[in-house]
Amino acid sequence: MNSLRLLGLVLTVLVCATQADAEELTGTLRKIKETGVINIGYRDSSIPFSYLDDNQKPIGFAIDICLKIVEAVKKELKLDKLTVEFNPVTSSTRIPLLANGTIDLECGSTTNNPDRLKQVAFTNTHFLTATRFISKKSSKLNSIEDLKGKSVASTSGTTNIRQLTETNASRNLGINIIPAKEHAESFLMVETDRAVAAVLDDILLASFAAGSKDPESYVISTDAFSRPEPYGIMLRKDDPAFKKVADEATSVLYRSEEGETLYQKWFMQKIPPKGLNLNVPMGAELKRAFARPTDSPDPDSYKAM
């Protein structure tokens, strides 16, 4: 009888402990624990960060980083299995889908800046980029001033189109800005001569040019609409427990040899599906950000020492 009572007491303690653990969880971690699912938002054409391969599977530098976060979440929650579901997002839908719980991580090419931090949070920086324009060499466009009075494409809902709009107004350039739904559409407008230039993050412009039918016919401006700005994995605002797991996972990754290997894989080697090699070495500023991980939106935080 005493043995049965002891067994009952042990079971009661275990059940209470399990319930207490569940009750202590909040926000995204609790959602994931209850459902056994983590939802990742991906882009379909943000090479090499987040895009679809020939089998329509999301791949890329940011996707690999997010999968490291998934591993950390699984370990944190002591789950035997954690299902990953991928959801497509665009520049216009990524923040709303994060806010309403459709996705838990946005793994793409999203700039961490003060305006976005009013709505969302970011984990540690994984890339630095500046807003520039791409054009055909035959157009002979060398500076931002050369875009005066011309049709220029940029993607809706991006920092790029905002910076283009502000520059257009402040310099009285009279540019006809053509909004595109996705980055690939912005570049396509230049390819098909519907626009003389496309304004995007310089690394995305490089990837589109490299994947075009005639890469040598395009040129990316040295003139920039911005200082180098940080990319980060986007997550919900005011969710410190989930952000802590993501920050720790990315910090460990970036400071390790695996972080360097991951960068080499996507920027210095041939990547699927077309075997492109972007050949973009890691700059001094990004090396510093990897050695000392930070989620700062301030470009000055990334100046090489």
Residue ranges, per PLM feature:
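Extracytoplasmic small-molecule ligand-binding "clamshell" domains
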Residues: 22-106
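Immediate post-signal peptide segment of exported/extracytoplasmic ligand-binding proteins
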Residues: 22-55, 140-150, 286-305
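Extended ligand-binding regions for polar small-molecule ligands
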Residues: 23, 29, 64-72, 145-146, ...
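Ligand-binding clefts/hinges and TM-proximal coupling segments of bilobed small-molecule sensing domains
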Residues: 23, 159-177, 216-218, 250-305
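Bilobed "Venus flytrap"/periplasmic-binding protein-like clamshell domains
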Residues: 39, 44-48, 58-75, 111, ...
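Periplasmic-binding protein-like
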Residues: 44, 127-138, 210-250, 269-294, ...
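Acidic, polar ligand-binding/catalytic clefts
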Residues: 67, 79-146, 287-298, 304
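A ligand-binding cleft/hinge motif common to bilobed small-molecule-binding domains
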Residues: 93, 107-118, 163-170, 188-192, ...
